[in-house]
């Protein structure tokens, strides 16, 4: 009887020990998995997804050339996240458009990685906005008008004067930037940014092995205000064919891009007052790169010459704060650097915010284009935008 009791007790003890061991192993496995999960989240953050859509209606009132149309201006999808907490990545794609022309096709517009450990010295590499002008890096909805100013479009890489494909102000390269001289409130007084780029726009390798150097610096004397300048030294190149009199030649040709901008801005939650003057020295190709065959056309646009400039002054002011805003813009561009080529657009309109993510922008434009036989005409635009 005693032997049976002893054996039963021993069996019970062994069973308890085995259960305890299994529990310990299970707890250790759970702790190990938890450590793995924590470790993974420390390395790569959960991606954040966002985007925006812009649709518009445009009517042009021009003698014998009236037109009106609905269109989808932009649909952009964005993914951002952190790696090792100090690196931020960004991927942005444009999903609307066609597949036949470079400037209107679905494409990757941003793909970059930026080291953000020190606000005084940040490093970005990949495809991203050129550091040139205040308006270029702005979200198109935040600009407050149906498009960037003419001079920004032509001299900051949107529909660039050189004939470069439409690149939304972007290029491939590396950039350093930083904010310096913090005041007693912690607001920095000086910002700098400078980068080295291919000079070919988005999704293109370098041609001609000459890089563009672009940079800017500004001071912020009071909150919301910045005053600064930008410079751009580089070129745009093509490899293909051109005619020199009666002789057809082949090889690589380039046009220079020597540009500077003088910029000033005041901005808060409702107010925007911004003005920029931009000057260009450097020629242009005869064709704009919309297709692969255009990239092989190396004929120069002799008529356009090698000088251009422009200026704009824009104001967006609150009528009802956070809800209703009035706006106006003076927008001058001289594609050949002369008044005979000048195109001036006077804009005025109203923007209404249904909420922070939904906005309707309306404007009327009076255009004076001296390159046309009949200089004057007008346009009306309604733009509807959604952020998500």
Where are the predicted features?
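N-terminal periplasmic/intermembrane-space "pro-region" immediately following the signal or transit peptide
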Residues: 1-54
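Residue-level detector of intrinsically disordered/flexible regions characterized by low predicted structural confidence
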Residues: 4-6, 37-38, 78, 278, ...
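Hydrophobic alpha-helical membrane context
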Residues: 15-16, 88, 288
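Intrinsic disorder/low-complexity signature
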Residues: 16, 21-24, 107, 209, ...
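Outer-membrane beta-barrel pore domains
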Residues: 23-27, 61-65, 84, 103, ...
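Outer membrane beta-barrel
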Residues: 36-199, 207-214, 218-227, 312-318, ...
């Amino acid at each position: 009887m005693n032997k049976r009791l002893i054996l039963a007790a021993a069996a019970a003890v062994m069973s308890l020990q085995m259960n305890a061991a299994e529990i310990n192993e299970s707890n250790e496995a759970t702790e190990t998995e938890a450590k793995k999960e924590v470790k993974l989240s420390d390395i790569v953050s959960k991606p954040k997804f966002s985007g925006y859509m812009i649709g518009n209606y445009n009517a042009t009132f021009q003698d014998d050339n009236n037109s009106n149309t609905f269109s989808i201006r932009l649909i952009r999808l964005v993914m951002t996240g952190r790696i090792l907490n100090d690196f931020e990545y960004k991927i942005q794609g444009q999903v609307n458009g066609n597949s036949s022309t470079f400037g209107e096709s679905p494409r990757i517009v941003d793909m970059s990685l930026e080291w953000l450990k020190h606000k005084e010295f940040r490093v970005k590499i990949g495809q991203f906005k050129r550091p040139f002008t205040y308006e270029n890096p702005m979200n198109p909805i935040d600009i407050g008008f149906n498009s960037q100013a003419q001079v920004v479009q032509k001299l900051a890489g949107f529909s660039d004067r050189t004939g470069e494909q439409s690149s939304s102000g972007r290029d491939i390269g590396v950039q350093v930037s930083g904010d310096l001289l913090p005041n007693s409130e912690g607001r920095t007084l000086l910002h700098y940014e400078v980068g080295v780029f291919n000079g070919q726009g988005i999704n293109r390798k370098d041609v001609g092995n000459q890089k563009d150097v672009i940079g800017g610096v500004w001071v912020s004397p009071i909150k919301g205000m910045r005053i600064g300048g930008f410079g751009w030294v580089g070129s745009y190149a093509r490899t293909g064919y051109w005619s020199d009199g009666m002789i057809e030649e082949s090889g690589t040709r380039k046009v220079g891009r020597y540009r500077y901008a003088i910029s000033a801005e005041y901005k808060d939650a409702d107010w925007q007052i911004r003005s920029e003057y931009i000057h260009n020295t450097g020629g242009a190709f005869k064709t704009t790169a919309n297709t692969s065959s255009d990239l092989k056309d190396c004929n120069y646009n002799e008529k356009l010459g090698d000088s251009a400039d422009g200026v704009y002054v824009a104001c967006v002011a609150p009528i009802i704060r956070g809800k209703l805003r009035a706006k106006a813009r003076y927008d001058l561009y001289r594609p050949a650097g002369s008044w005979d080529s000048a195109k001036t657009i006077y804009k005025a309109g109203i923007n209404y915010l249904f909420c922070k993510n939904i906005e309707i922008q309306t404007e009327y434009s009076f255009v004076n284009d001296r390159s046309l036989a009949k200089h004057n005409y007008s346009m009306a635009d309604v733009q509807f935008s959604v952020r998500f």
